[in-house]
Amino acid sequence: MNRRVAIINDLKRYDRMAYLNSVSIISAFGDRAYIDIEEDKKYDAFLSGYIADSSKILEYRELIGDAKLDNQRALFLCDPVFADNGKRYENITDTHIENYKKLMEVSDIITPNFTEALMLIDEPYKENCEKYKIIKYENDSKEKIDILSKKIIESFFPILNKIRFKKNQISVITGIELYNAVLTILDVYDGDHGKRQTTCNYSEKIEDRSGAGEIFDAMFFETSTNGFNLVDSLSATTSFINNSLRFSRDKNIDPKLGIFFEPILYENLMVMRNKLIERNKQFKGEENVRH
């Protein structure tokens, strides 16, 4: 699509491999990835992740806010990277978290993991974590999945209602561990019309590797702005991450080296493209039947 996408992520200093995941995926979709923001350039989208200096978070808020005023179609995906597995990262202060909240006030999409989501709204981690870890995912029938999803979504509404930082916002909470699966919650809230769509996505537990968050953000951004609806985008994104984790494991890649996905990126993009074509054909067929 040849869009200018600014990537704001201090992992380029600490974990270059994870950081480059974003660049690889954005480039594969035909967009141009820019490292950080230059004030004299115009951007079509912004992806933010780990920001080491808490004061810089507010600077980015102002820069992105001004950029979105100049280009109202510019999209901002904010991943407030500061914690995991119930614990903050070493250098994270209360100021970091408060400033991330302010940054999310100008974002269109937020993608915190479960720990970050709970910390952002001052909810206890252990109690919530234990509540979901006992839930068993059974996929032997669509009816069972639908019943489970409805139950989980209803239990999640108090969290989703608190974590929304602007009137119209897409919230994606990742890394929610169930007994035998990993859950991702997508909540699309349209405050202008009082509409809401919330859905669950279940994926296999494989293994933890650095860089999954950067892959998720870049792939979800690209698929959701390249013809996929948000539910299909989430499904395509989690499927790609799982395929990449399996590939890394099967190739005996050291987990310290992150996720090895480049050899299967093109193949997976072709699968996504074909699914999108089939879905569009199906949609057109349904439209013809209705008319």
Labelled PLM ranges:
Residues 119, 206-230, 234-236:
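Short, small-residue alpha-helix embedded
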Residues 148-163, 229-245:
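Short, well-structured alpha-helical segments that form the helix of a local strand-helix-strand
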Residues 231-291:
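Charged C-terminal helix
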Residues 12-14, 197-211:
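Short pre-catalytic strand/loop immediately N-terminal to key active-site residues, enriched for Gly-Thr
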Residues 1-36, 283-291:
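Glycine-rich phosphate/adenosyl-contacting loop at the front of the ribokinase-like
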Residues 65-76, 165-169:
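A short helix->loop->beta-strand "cap" motif at the edges of active sites that frequently abuts
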Residues 90-196:
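Conserved phosphate/ATP/ADP-binding segment of small-molecule kinases
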